[in-house]
Swiss-Prot record:
Family statement: Belongs to the GcvH family.
Textual note on the cofactor: Binds 1 lipoyl cofactor covalently.
One Pfam family cited in the UniProt record for this chain: GCV_H
Record-annotated Lipoyl-binding domain positions: 29-110
Cofactors that this protein relies on: (R)-lipoate
Protein name: Probable glycine cleavage system H protein
Entry superkingdom: Archaea
Subunit text: The glycine cleavage system is composed of four proteins: P, T, L and H.
Keywords attached to this entry: Lipoyl
Cross-referenced InterPro entries: 2-oxoA_DH_lipoyl-BS, Biotin_lipoyl, GCV_H, GCV_H/Fam206, GCV_H_sub, Single_hybrid_motif
Physiological role: The glycine cleavage system catalyzes the degradation of glycine. The H protein shuttles the methylamine group of glycine from the P protein to the T protein.
Residue(s) carrying N6-lipoyllysine: 70
Length: 134
């Protein structure tokens, strides 16, 4: 784990400037969630609008929304592909994202252009440097 101030960054993941993370699984699918920075900025999450299984997204499309006491925030697709699974636990327990943002994934995506799109994402060290600029 890398720490930047109060924010934790899990190594081995890829990150976006919009504070989503991507974990590449052995079968070539990816898990997507929001970072520690994102959940702390949002505050206590009250609701996660999970995407539909089967939804096809392009990188940068709105994947879903998360709602906190403070704000509603869009979560963007960090890679293009098809949503093949969602984390149903979050429907009843959105606070799991606050408790452990790197375990509480939102969606599993079957990517269509992963190798190319990963090049556009940051690794943990680059994301840590990015957080220092905020």
């Amino acid at each position: 784990m890398i720490e930047v101030g109060e924010y934790k960054i899990k190594e081995g993941l890829y990150y976006t400037k919009e504070h989503e993370w991507v974990q590449v699984l052995e079968d070539g699918t990816v898990l997507v969630g929001i970072t520690d920075y994102a959940q702390k900025e949002l505050g206590d999450l009250a609701y996660v609008e999970l995407p539909e299984v089967g939804k096809v997204v392009e990188k940068g499309d709105v994947l879903c929304e998360v709602e906190s006491v403070k704000a509603v925030s869009e979560v963007y697709a960090p890679v293009s592909g098809e949503v093949i699974e969602v984390n149903e636990e979050l429907a009843d327990s959105p606070e799991k994202i606050n408790e452990d943002p790197y375990e509480a994934w939102i969606a599993k995506i079957k990517p269509k252009n992963l190798e190319e799109e990963l090049k556009e994402l940051m690794d943990a060290k680059a994301y840590a440097e990015y957080l220092k600029t905020l």
